[in-house]
Structures are given as C-alpha cells and as structure tokens.
C-alpha cells in the first residue's frame, strides 16, 4: 500500500508536459490510445447538440450597442421591460446585455425592430 501512495505522490508532482509524455509512453507500452474515447464522446456530444438548435423556440433579445440616439433607446427599453428610468439607463449603458430573455421568435423580431427603430444595434440569440 505504501508503494501506491508513493506512486500517487510522484504522479501528483508531474508537470503537464511530463504527464503528457508519461501518457504517450504508457500508450506505447500497453498498445492503447487514450485519444480514441475522447474523440468518440466529442462527436456524440456534437450530434446531440444539433437537434436542440433545430427545435429552438425561445430567443433572447440582446442590446449590443445603444447607438447615437441613446435617449430614444432608453425610452424603448423602459416600454419593453417595464424598468424604471435608472435601471433602463444602466441596461443601455452596460451593453451588450439582454433586454428580454426566452421570448417567442415573433416577439423577438418585433422587439428587435422597435429597438433598431430607436437607433440601437440588437442581436437575437
């Protein structure tokens, strides 16, 4: 048992480069590859993420920039969110920030149009 504790202690003191070299040496000695399971898991994760994007029904309206007409943008943010003057001003000046989250595609497009008409730059994600 003392030998295992020493091995653990020795492995813990390795640098990242030394650990990578150790990994390569063990792969060669045992005839295995540590990279194969990781690549398969990454490919599976990417395939699983694709259907989620296709089914997206909720969108976030992000104010990326207030533009030159900040006062009109603040008024529009207040109308959309129901925030007070100070909170709306802080949101506009702190761009990029979410104005509304988890809204339908139609509502997100409507909010984007209103904010852009007020002079803001907006992203829908």
From Swiss-Prot:
One of the record's GO cellular component terms:
cytosolic large ribosomal subunit
The record, for HAMAP family, names:
Ribosomal_bL12
Which Pfam family, any one, appears in the UniProt record?
Answer: Ribosomal_L12
What is the annotated role of this protein in its UniProt record?
Forms part of the ribosomal stalk which helps the ribosome interact with GTP-bound translation factors. Is thus essential for accurate translation.
InterPro entries membership: Ribosomal_bL12, Ribosomal_bL12_C, Ribosomal_bL12_C/ClpS-like, Ribosomal_bL12_oligo, Ribosomal_bL12_oligo_N_sf
Enumerate the GO terms in the molecular function aspect. Answer: mRNA binding; structural constituent of ribosome
User: Which GO biological-process labels does this protein carry?
Assistant: translation
Organism domain of life:
Bacteria
Gene3D superfamilies registered for this protein in UniProt: 3.30.1390.10, Single helix bin (1.20.5.710)
Complex formation: Homodimer. Part of the ribosomal stalk of the 50S ribosomal subunit. Forms a multimeric L10(L12)X complex, where L10 forms an elongated spine to which 2 to 4 L12 dimers bind in a sequential fashion. Binds GTP-bound translation factors.
The record's listing under SUPFAM superfamilies reads: ClpS-like, Ribosomal protein L7/12, oligomerisation (N-terminal) domain
Q: What is this protein called?
A: Large ribosomal subunit protein bL12
The entry sums up its family as follows: Belongs to the bacterial ribosomal protein bL12 family.
Which terms are listed as keywords in the entry?
Answer: Ribonucleoprotein, Ribosomal protein
């Amino acid at each position: 048992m003392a030998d295992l504790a020493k091995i653990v202690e020795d492995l813990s003191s390795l640098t990242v480069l030394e650990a990578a070299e150790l990994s390569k040496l063990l792969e060669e000695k045992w005839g295995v590859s540590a990279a194969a399971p990781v690549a398969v898991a990454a490919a599976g994760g990417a395939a699983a993420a694709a259907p989620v994007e296709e089914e997206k029904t909720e969108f976030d309206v992000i104010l990326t920039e207030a533009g030159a007409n900040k006062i009109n943008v603040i008024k529009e943010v207040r109308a959309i969110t129901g925030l007070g003057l100070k909170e709306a001003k802080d949101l506009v000046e702190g761009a990029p920030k979410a104005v509304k989250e988890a809204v339908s595609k139609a509502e997100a497009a409507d909010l984007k149009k209103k904010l852009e008409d007020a002079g803001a730059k907006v992203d829908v994600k």
